């Protein structure tokens, strides 16, 4: 795996690969965590003194970054958590069978794992709005 790392030691995402265990007929994704999302914890994070948020967007489309940053920025500016509709937009923009708060809430376990179903298409209508 080390030989395949990109310049500047960027991640080659082995956690997203399928593995087949000896004796198994089908490969699975035993290392693939759902995306961590603390969108519903913005006010709590602010109270804790968090002054900066990191968005994992290195391998995502620019429209994804636009959708996510708009939702977070609007919610923070208005001093509120994202609405249900905004949370649905976040999930539509990109998620692996939903999001997890597992490490933040110390709820580690199988519910933290998920994959993006094969053939999932990008939400072009949502992304078109981001481009407008």
Predicted feature descriptions by range:
Residues 1-132:
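Surface-exposed amphipathic alpha-helical tracts and adjacent flexible/coil segments at the periphery
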